[in-house]
Each structure stands twice: as structure tokens, then as C-alpha cells.
Amino acid sequence: MGEGVNMEIYNESILWDEYFDALEKRNYEKALLLIDKILEVRESPDVYVRKARILRTLGENDKALEYFDKALKLKPKYILANFLKGALLVSLGKLEEAKEVFLKLCRLEKSDLPVKYVTAFILKKLGEYDYALKIIDKILKKYPKSAIAWAEKGEILYREGKLKKSLECFDNALKINPKDCQSLLYKGEILFKLGRYGEALKCLKKVFERNNKDIRALMYIIQILIYLGRLNQALEYTKKALKLNPDDPLLYLYKGIILNKLGKYNEAIKYFDKVLEINPNIPDAWNGKAIALEKLGKINEAIECYNRALDIYE
């Protein structure tokens, strides 16, 4: 070894080479041992963050949080450490703690768009809609063509019951990104709730064309077709939905309602009974069965079913 070489730096360099090699081979236990050796040579926030990330990969989340905190003790405004700590807290469902981390990040001058998005997401999950909207409006002021921000704003307004304002936001999101199925689904739901069934059906069918396993879109399509009296089509979509989700009592209920409307009362009763086998406390199933029994002239049985429905409603 030549004169003037700092052995400590040389040894650390070897450790880093071995560490990156272990990471590449996904040998996380070895990488962790090497990080500990590096920490013996040099304590730094970057190294603590690396250790925290390995611990998270290994599922040792509490220890990972401990090392993110060690990094932040040395460098409180370390954006990456704050972000990763906050993201871990979100994944653990610790939203209040995550909120504090991301609000701190938002106050930093260098906070970027992902930070603001995640902060708004957390606030939305916590039901702090006004605060979330303030952050989203700041994003939209700077990035008016952010489809994600328009969609987030639309979802919050939807949760607040402000359907027309929410619809405007989803329309803006879809102008920017027409392939956004989630925004299209929300648009369909809103149009349905506003009684604009034809427009809603068009949106929801587009969602289903793009993703034929979207049960939520199917549920709304079935309801709309029932409202529009297009019963045979509703029946076909119900069959498709039952293939995807054969244990959903609501689908059996829809099928029973459709069969009742088609005058197929004996078949309808079978489906209402299936609903009641899964959950005997669904009043609409008792009510639907009562209607079918009444149409079949089985008045006493119908009265009994009506009474069961009334007991649940009360």
C-alpha cells in the first residue's frame, strides 16, 4: 500500500463495495452487518437511513423507525429521511404520526410535489378535508394540469357531498388524462347520484370495457339498467358480476329484484333466499320475497315476510 493512504477511508471503501454487492444479490442480512461495520467507522444520517431501509425490507418496522429517528436527530431537515419515515408510518396505519412528519416536510422550502400529494392523501384519510383541499389548491395553482391533483380534489368534494363541484374536478382530470379509470368511475357514480342515468351508464361501461373485473362499475351498471327498465341487460350484467364475486348478497338481491320485475316470481324467491342465507338481516330481501309471494297468491307467507322486513327497519 502506497504512502499517504488513509487506512480508515480504504477500509470503509471496501465495506461499501461489499455492501452494494450484498444489496445487488438481495442478501439483506449481510448488507445489514456491513452497514453496522460502516457505522463503527463513520456515524452519519445517510448511513442510518440506509440501515433503516434494510430493516424495513426485512419487516423490522419498529427498528427502521428508530434508525430514521437517529438520522433525523443528526439532520432534522433531511428530506429523504423524513419522507421515508412518513411513508413507513402511512403503511403501518399510523396516520396521525405520518401527518406530523409530512406537514413538517411541507414547511421546508425544498418540499416537492410527491410530499404535497402524500400530505393531502393523509389528511383526506383522516377526514381533515378543508386542510387537504388547501394543499391541493396550492398544487393546482402551481401545476394546473396535474390530473392527480384534480382527481384528489374531486374525491374529497365527493366525500363532502358536493357532487357538482366534484364532477367538475373529475372532468378536468379526464381532460388531462382520458385513460384515468378511477376518475371515470367516480364521474359515473356522481352522474348516477345526480339522476343522469344515460351519461352515467356511458362512463361506467367505458370503465368496464377497460377493466372487466371492476365490480364497483358493474354494481352501478346493474342499478342503472334496473332504473331504466332494461331488465334483460341488467340480468346479463348481474351474471357477469356473480362470476367475479359469487358470495356477494347484494348481487343475489339485484337478481331477485330483476326476476320479480320480469314476473319470474318463483325464481326470484330462490335468489332472495340465497341473500337471507348469507345475511338474514337484509330487509330488502324480505320485502322482495314478500312481493313475489303476494304475486303468487301466498298471502300469509307474504305477510310474514313483510313483518320480518318491518322488524329490521325498526
UniProtKB/Swiss-Prot annotation:
SMART domains: TPR. It holds the Pfam family TPR_1. TPR repeats lie at residues 12-45, 46-78, 80-112, 114-146, 147-180, 182-214, 215-248, 249-282, 284-313. The keyword Cell membrane does not apply. Keywords: Repeat, TPR repeat. It comes from the Archaea. InterPro entries: TPR-like_helical_dom_sf (IPR011990), TPR_rpt (IPR019734), Ycf3/AcsC/BcsC/TPR_MFPF (IPR051685). This is TPR repeat-containing protein MJ1345.
